[in-house]
């Protein structure tokens, strides 16, 4: 009896094994969440690791929501749009190994739709290096953006809530022909990043922006390190270094609506004009600079050695 049960169990086991041998590859590959790209590949292309797509664009044409597109080392000369809920990941944690360079310099090199992510990649050239489209949530991690014809990263407007937040973490934005980062009204987190050597401002935030800036360096930009419009904005900053910029360390503009800019543990030094410039764009704007809040005690800022002084008088810019 026990022997018969044993053999029945083996038969069932063999049958199940045969079933899974047939069905599991269909489940794994049919519902695959990772698609591979390798420009040096030859032959058939189906997005598997054995037969990767040869271009990022081809891979993106075939992906579904929830897919990760993993890119092998190399320079890919393309302009791409990342579809909704797709991740673009360089295969090496050395972000200089995977380069996306604009084929058409009149278009953004990379455009990002809603719930998209990009990491371990260098983006070069294009009208903008990266354009984050309206009403989207996006995340960049360990990315370099450089040599674009306009803004390095251009962020279109959205509601200022977590659902539409843009997270920029451990990025380098450098040598772009306009601002390093330009943002319309948004909720933005910028941390652990270098914004350097851009031909206009390091970052330029429109009115109504909510932003957290932490542990960043803004240096060597031809404009101001940080440029903001205070009206209806809520901006918080801690442990940022803003130095050697061609204009002000921070340029604060206002048209008269209230807003806040909180600075803690900032180092604002050796900028060509003021450490902090206060520019009223209307008569009413001259009365709203109380929204600039400077940390004290353990949160005190170092604002020193700026060519025209630490904090400007109110400058009338109209």
Predicted regions and their residues:
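N-terminal secretory signal peptides that target proteins for export/translocation
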Residues: 1-8
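Bacterial N-terminal signal peptides
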Residues: 14-25
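Right-handed parallel beta-helix/beta-solenoid
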Residues: 27-58, 91
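Right-handed parallel beta-helix/beta-spiral solenoid domain characteristic of secreted/periplasmic
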Residues: 39, 86-131
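Acidic glycine-/aspartate-rich tracts in secreted/extracellular proteins
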Residues: 40-44, 67, 74-75, 92-95
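Beta-strand repeat architectures
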Residues: 60-67, 114-116
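Short glycine/acidic-rich loop motifs that flank beta-strands on beta-rich extracellular proteins
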Residues: 68, 76-82, 99, 103-108, ...
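Right-handed parallel beta-helix
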Residues: 91, 97, 115-125, 137-149, ...
